Design a protein with these regions (language model features):
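Activation segment
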Residues: 18, 51, 73, 94-95
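Short, flexible loop/turn elements at secondary-structure junctions
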Residues: 13, 40, 46, 67-68, ...
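Surface-exposed recognition segments
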Residues: 32, 84-188
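A short glycine-rich, aromatic-capped structural motif
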Residues: 2-57
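Conserved small/polar residues in nucleotide/adenosyl-binding loops
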Residues: 199-206
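Membrane-interfacial hairpin junctions
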Residues: 186-198
Length: 209
């Protein structure tokens, strides 16, 4: 690995995920803090996976996790890359159940590769199909320790039921009731609004029960 330039990342915390509803905004949540308690090195630039796959398979290096990548980016240690970089994490739909100590998160039945897409000096989260044929550009890491933290915090396996019900009610309101009323306001005959209101409210009450 003599050809790789490394930068050192000291322990610290970063934030991952979106606080927006994934189904409405296309960004997995919840937003959460990750505390990395170990020192590690990350490659100064992205590398073709095909060039380091042997070293990854031998355990000499590892592909960077999303948290490790983000902490290095937050500190200005990596910048102005090109295109899309693939990280080690894999998601199905959310971060629920993730252990928040910096290790990669592999969700059961995962179908999405967690990535970062460079846009000038900014890097935004991207989620590509796991079977994507995009050439994989990765950053590799060398960790001070390979032992997971047994006391690391973990997100709940699933979101609180009250939060889910509140989000579903908001989706029904935004995508169902409000558009119906707006359409009725300009197009419907008298009495249509009362019918739509009753129908939507009954449907929501039935689902809640």
């Amino acid at each position: 690995m003599e050809s790789i330039d490394w930068v050192v990342v000291e322990p610290g915390s970063t934030y991952i995920g979106s606080s927006n509803r994934a189904v409405m905004f296309g960004a997995p949540g919840p937003r959460h803090e990750v505390s990395i308690q170990y020192r590690y090195e990350i490659s100064d630039s992205a590398i073709k996976l095909s060039e380091v796959v042997t070293s990854v398979e031998s355990g000499e290096v590892d592909i960077s996790s999303e948290s490790e990548w983000q902490l290095a980016f937050d500190r200005g240690l990596i910048s102005e890359g090109l295109g899309i970089e693939v990280l080690q994490d894999r998601l199905a739909s959310s971060y629920w159940g993730k252990i928040c100590d910096g290790r990669p998160f592999h969700q059961r039945n995962s179908s999405l590769m967690v990535c970062r897409e460079w846009r000038g000096r900014e890097a935004i989260p991207r989620y590509l199909p796991a079977n994507s044929e995009t050439e994989h550009m990765v950053r590799v890491v060398r960790r001070e320790t390979r032992e997971p933290n047994p006391m690391a915090p973990r997100l709940p396996i699933r979101p609180p039921r009250t939060a889910v019900m509140r989000e579903e009610a908001l989706i029904i309101l935004i995508l169902g009731i409000i558009p119906s009323f707006l359409w009725a306001l300009f197009n419907a005959s008298p009495g249509y609004i009362e019918t739509v209101s009753y129908t939507h409210l009954r449907a929501h009450e039935t689902k809640a029960n």
